[in-house]
From Swiss-Prot:
Entry-linked InterPro entries: Aas, AMP-bd_C, AMP-bd_C_sf, AMP-binding_CS, AMP-dep_synth/lig_dom, ANL_N_sf, Plipid/glycerol_acylTrfase
Protein name (Swiss-Prot/TrEMBL): Bifunctional protein Aas
Chain segments carrying region AMP-binding: 233-646
Acyltransferase as annotated region, ranges: 15-138
Sequence similarity: In the N-terminal section; belongs to the 2-acyl-GPE acetyltransferase family.
GO molecular function, one term: acyl-[acyl-carrier-protein]-phospholipid O-acyltransferase activity
A Pfam short name: AMP-binding_C
Cellular-component GO terms for this entry: membrane; plasma membrane
Active site: 36
Domain of life: Bacteria
Stated role: Plays a role in lysophospholipid acylation. Transfers fatty acids to the 1-position via an enzyme-bound acyl-ACP intermediate in the presence of ATP and magnesium. Its physiological function is to regenerate phosphatidylethanolamine from 2-acyl-glycero-3-phosphoethanolamine (2-acyl-GPE) formed by transacylation reactions or degradation by phospholipase A1.
Catalytic activity: a 2-acyl-sn-glycero-3-phosphoethanolamine + a fatty acyl-[ACP] = a 1,2-diacyl-sn-glycero-3-phosphoethanolamine + holo-[ACP]; a long-chain fatty acid + holo-[ACP] + ATP = a long-chain fatty acyl-[ACP] + AMP + diphosphate
EC number: 2.3.1.40, 6.2.1.20
UniProt lineage: Bacteria, Pseudomonadati, Pseudomonadota, Gammaproteobacteria, Enterobacterales
Length: 718
């Protein structure tokens, strides 16, 4: 009777629903593993699960007054994590057919993300052979019974959902010692819990996700700031978004690809969301690619209109672009301010109250945004991402990293790059963090000063940028920073060392590609390993394809919710080329993406990048990584610029060429370093060419197409 009354009360107050695979509770041996977000979790499961389970509760909690009060109504067993006999007792209960609920995190989350996973539950599952049913609780964290006050906008009676995921098992890991088996089983359970979170992500468009964040964290919560030093709340950002969307629809049509040539600024964020909510697809253009690069993007994406700013073009010394690229209609934001009418203002005011009514009908799987590859190995390609793929990558990042509304991001990486867009804009907005948008990562003195001045806690950058920030920064500039993540290029040992020595900060290395929105793997405090780029993100499948001549590692191919919709190529304008990859049998598999990177994956799932397939040279039948050649030069001259290329050779098929800005580098010195590092002499180039500077792309990466031509033609210069 008491159960029925409480169930009716909870259902009335919290509108509790239970969904998913609800017939998963008939297994003979069963362990239920929910996430832990509030003090209500146990009561919710006891009231709404179709079975009467035993709750494994840590001894520190069983002695509290409310647990003593609940004892007559709920079965629970005290679990002492320091006592091995407690685990054996649980195993016996499971083997006797009692369904057991264990909260693997062991404590209520204080970040909104998964906390540390204790391996006890996993070891019980592996030892007993029980089915593991993950459960995802959504909603209790918003109540006053959670521990996220000040992180989320708490309320008295939020809607609560109980999602039941498909049952799985944890096989006993193969390891010589019991301790190692426990750890491996715990990692398996952590993977299951992360997958459960990814499986219950709502399918939304970018604009819907922004509105959800506003609801979650509060409409007046400050969220975004730029060099104007005027911080906007979610409400103010929404107002700007609606204003831009209203004006954009005058000279564009639904479904049109709209070019955007804009800096890192709040108005750019408003333009992206504004175009998206009215069914337009923003194409973020690389303003460092020059007229030729813009023309390639215009052809590939079939652009008719480019939105930009006169002030930006003047400050960036880009005023020549509209004159040289005259095949599109250039629209200037400054010219649009005076065109806002009273009708427009009333439309904006109405939709501030009812923002979802401003949206045109869209699907989460539909095209949301176009980015462009760097063009380091040919013409830039348009990469079309859906709303779902972009938001999936944000959720993957949120699943493994504990970003909260207490964090402040410094975002100086250009928004036209996937790294800057997803990590520097979408992730902070969707996690309730505040973000400072700065227009250039090249201001090595200014960026550290702003990190200090704005109390930033999260900084992302390339190895080159981070190294230069460290050289110019005061030792106290990064005192509040807790996450520094390097990506887009290999993290130099010198950069890693200076951050450790000068600031006491460990740089976490990650790996991504534009086609994956972009983050593929990342080291985080909970799971980090030196000389790797971290584990592949939850929700993604990875496979390695053998490459003839390369003994260590394989060609990385990926499938997952964050994979692009497809390419737009200059050779086939406006036609979407869907992703596919050749499997080990030589057959094309749809929805797989071939990264072209040679990687290794260890037994714990950590990924190490060995090089790109296209950046290997075949010398007398042996495959040599051009990146390994560059690392030899970097060891000799950390401050210099170095890049390796291959040229045709009548004797060996191909020969190595090293381009360097350091005239002190010789073959003899390279051979000495190679021997010290166990690198074969075959990887030491005979052709060493000193240049004033390497040819670079707008992104700062070496232009390997030009370097390849220079390698073939000794007379050619930058």
């Amino acid at each position: 009777m008491a159960y029925r009354l409480l169930r009716a009360l909870f259902r009335g107050l919290f509108r509790v629903t239970i969904d998913g695979v609800t017939d998963q509770f008939k297994h003979e041996k069963l362990i239920i593993t929910p996430n832990h977000v509030s003090f209500l979790d146990g009561a919710l499961l006891a009231l709404f699960l179709p079975i009467k389970p035993v709750f494994a509760v840590y001894t520190s909690i069983t002695d509290t007054w409310y647990m003593r009060w609940l004892k007559p109504y709920v079965d629970f067993v005290a679990l002492d994590p320091t006592n091995p006999m407690a685990i054996k007792h649980l195993v016996r209960m499971v083997e006797q057919g009692r369904p057991v609920v264990i909260f693997p995190e062991g404590r209520i989350t204080v970040t909104g993300s998964l906390m540390k996973i204790y391996d006890g539950a996993a070891f019980v599952a592996a030892k007993s052979g029980a089915a593991v049913v993950p459960i995802r609780l959504d909603g209790p964290e918003f109540t006053h019974f959670g521990r996220l006050q000040g992180v989320l906008k708490t309320r008295w009676f939020p809607k609560i959902s109980i999602h039941v995921l498909p049952a799985t098992t944890i096989p006993m890991p193969q390891a010589p010692r019991s301790r190692e088996r426990r750890v491996l089983a715990g990692e398996h359970l952590h993977t299951i819990m992360m997958a459960a979170r990814m499986a219950t992500v709502p399918r939304e468009t970018l604009f819907e996700a922004l509105l959800s964040a506003q609801t979650r964290y509060g409409r007046f919560k400050p969220c975004i700031e730029d060099v104007s030093f005027k911080e906007d709340s979610y409400q103010t950002l929404l107002k700007k978004t609606l204003g831009v969307s209203r004006i954009l629809q005058r000279f564009t049509v639904p479904g049109e690809h709209v070019g955007m040539l804009l800096p890192n600024a709040t108005i750019t964020a408003a333009a992206i969301f504004g175009a998206s909510l009215r069914g337009r697809i923003p194409a973020l253009l690389n303003y460092t690619s020059g007229a030729k690069g813009l023309q390639s993007a215009i052809i590939a994406a079939s652009l008719k209109t480019i939105v930009t700013s006169r002030q930006f073009l003047e400050k960036g010394k880009l005023t020549h672009l509209p004159e040289q690229v005259n095949e599109v209609n250039w629209v200037y934001l400054e010219d649009l301010k005076d065109t806002v009418t009273l009708t427009d203002k009333l439309w904006i005011l109405f939709h501030l109250c009812f923002p979802r009514r401003a949206m045109l009908p869209q699907q989460a799987d539909g095209s949301a945004l176009i980015l462009f590859t760097s063009g380091s190995e040919g013409n830039p390609k348009g990469v079309v991402h859906s709303h779902a793929s972009l938001l999936a990558n944000v959720e993957q990042i949120r699943t493994i990293a504990d970003f909260t509304p207490r964090d402040r991001f410094m975002s100086s990486l250009p928004l036209f790059h996937a790294f800057g867009l997803t990590v520097g804009l979408f992730t902070p907005l969707m996690t309730g963090s505040r973000v400072f948008l700065y227009p250039s990562p090249l201001h090595y003195r200014v960026v550290p000063e702003l990190v200090y001045d704005r109390n930033c806690t999260v900084l992302f950058g390339t190895s080159t940028f981070l190294g230069n920030y460290a050289r110019f920064a005061h030792p106290y500039d990064f005192a509040r920073v807790r996450y520094v993540v390097a990506g887009a290029e290999k993290l130099a040992e010198s950069t890693k060392q200076i951050w450790q020595d000068k600031f006491g900060i460990r740089i976490l290395e990650g790996y991504g590609v534009t086609e994956c929105a972009p983050v593929v793997a990342i080291n985080v405090p909970m799971a980090a390993k030196v000389n790797t780029v971290g584990r592949i993100l939850p929700g993604m499948e990875a496979r390695l394809i053998n490459v003839p001549g390369i003994a260590q590692g394989g060609r990385l191919q990926l499938r997952g919710p964050n994979i692009m919709r497809g390419y737009l190529r200059v050779e086939n304008p406006g036609v979407l080329e869907q992703p596919s990859a050749e499997n080990a049998q030589g057959e094309l598999d749809a929805n797989w993406y071939d990264t072209g990177d040679i990687v290794t994956l260890d037994e714990q799932g950590f990924c190490a990048i060995r090089g790109r397939v296209k950046r290997f040279a075949k010398l007398a039948g042996e495959m040599v990584s051009l990146e390994s050649v560059e690392q030899l030069a970097i060891s000799l001259s950390p401050e210099g610029q170095h890049a390796a290329a291959a040229k045709t050779d009548s004797a060996k098929g191909e020969a190595l060429v090293l381009f360097t800005t350091d005239s002190e580098i010789t073959r003899e010195r390279l051979i000495k370093v190679a021997r010290e590092n166990g690198v074969p002499e075959l990887a030491v180039p005979r052709d060493i060419r000193v240049v004033k500077a390497l040819p670079l792309l707008g992104s700062g990466k070496p232009d390997f197409v030009t370097l390849g031509k220079m390698a073939q033609d000794p007379e050619m210069s930058v």
